[in-house]
Amino acid sequence: MSAKTDEILDSLKSLSLLEASELVKQIEEAFGVSAAASAGVVMAAPGAAAGGDGADAAEEKTEFEVVLESFEASSKIKVLKEVRNATGLGLGEAKALVEAAPKTIKEGATKEDAEALKKAIEAVGGKVTLK
């Protein structure tokens, strides 16, 4: 990397969470982009690539889709926290995702990660399927 990009990276590493959030908002406004939309596109890409190998995927699946099917109303906040932890989404995006169940919450996950996420969400009252 160049000295300039190294310097920028070092500056970003020193930002507090609040400063990083403000920076994201400023970048979204300045460039007319949305961080949430690009995260969704990035998350969708591995799943799309896995779907292209129909014959290989039938033999042994290596990437999984974690789908939140439903949740107990009394456990909504706990499920929301688990979804946020797994996806890195903000509160608003995670809330919209949970309320839109059934909805894919993670794509391209390894078998171990998918099963761990399923177990964590089911432990707090959610119903999850792996595809």
From Swiss-Prot:
Gene3D superfamilies xrefs: 3.30.1390.10, Single helix bin (1.20.5.710)
Disulfide bridge map: none
Record's keyword terms, sorted: Ribonucleoprotein, Ribosomal protein
GO biological process terms on file: translation
InterPro entries: Ribosomal_bL12, Ribosomal_bL12_C, Ribosomal_bL12_C/ClpS-like, Ribosomal_bL12_oligo, Ribosomal_bL12_oligo_N_sf
Keyword Ribonucleoprotein: yes
GO cellular component, one term: cytosolic large ribosomal subunit
UniProt xrefs under Pfam families: Ribosomal_L12, Ribosomal_L12_N
GO molecular function: mRNA binding; structural constituent of ribosome
Family affiliation: Belongs to the bacterial ribosomal protein bL12 family.
Function: Forms part of the ribosomal stalk which helps the ribosome interact with GTP-bound translation factors. Is thus essential for accurate translation.
Subunit structure: Homodimer. Part of the ribosomal stalk of the 50S ribosomal subunit. Forms a multimeric L10(L12)X complex, where L10 forms an elongated spine to which 2 to 4 L12 dimers bind in a sequential fashion. Binds GTP-bound translation factors.
PANTHER family tied to this protein: 39S RIBOSOMAL PROTEIN L12, LARGE RIBOSOMAL SUBUNIT PROTEIN BL12M
The protein, known as: Large ribosomal subunit protein bL12
Organism expressing this protein natively: Prochlorococcus marinus (strain NATL2A)
Lineage, top ranks: Bacteria, Bacillati, Cyanobacteriota, Cyanophyceae, Synechococcales
